[in-house]
């Protein structure tokens, strides 16, 4: 999957670990949405 920046990772992508994964159809079972705003396409989810 494509990595994304969770709210808990920090304010921007530079120098931070991207712990989320982008899911286009929503977070799968057992995962949660970890970013309050965005991404533009899909959801940023983590286990």
Swiss-Prot record:
UniProt cross-references to InterPro entries, sorted A to Z: Anenome_toxin, Myo_ane_neurotoxin_sf
Disulfide bond residue pairs: 4-44, 6-34, 27-45
Gene Ontology terms: cellular component: extracellular region; nematocyst
Compartments where found: Secreted; Nematocyst
GO MF annotations, alphabetized: sodium channel regulator activity; toxin activity
Keyword Transferase listed: no
Pfam families hit by this protein: Toxin_4
Keyword check for Disulfide bond: yes
GO BP: regulation of signal transduction
Keywords: Cardiotoxin, Disulfide bond, Ion channel impairing toxin, Nematocyst, Neurotoxin, Secreted, Toxin, Voltage-gated sodium channel impairing toxin
Function: Binds specifically to voltage-gated sodium channels (Nav), thereby delaying their inactivation. This toxin is active on a variety of voltage-gated sodium channels (Nav1.1/SCN1A, Nav1.2/SCN2A, Nav1.3/SCN3A, Nav1.4/SCN4A, Nav1.5/SCN5A and Nav1.6/SCN8A).
Family label: Belongs to the sea anemone sodium channel inhibitory toxin family. Type I subfamily.
Protein name in UniProt: Delta-actitoxin-Afv1a
Organism of derivation: Anthopleura fuscoviridis (Sea anemone)
């Amino acid at each position: 999957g494509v990595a994304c920046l969770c709210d808990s990772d920090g304010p921007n992508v530079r120098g931070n670990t991207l712990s989320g994964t982008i899911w286009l159809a929503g977070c799968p079972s057992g995962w949660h949405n970890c970013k309050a705003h965005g991404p533009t396409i899909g959801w940023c989810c983590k286990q």
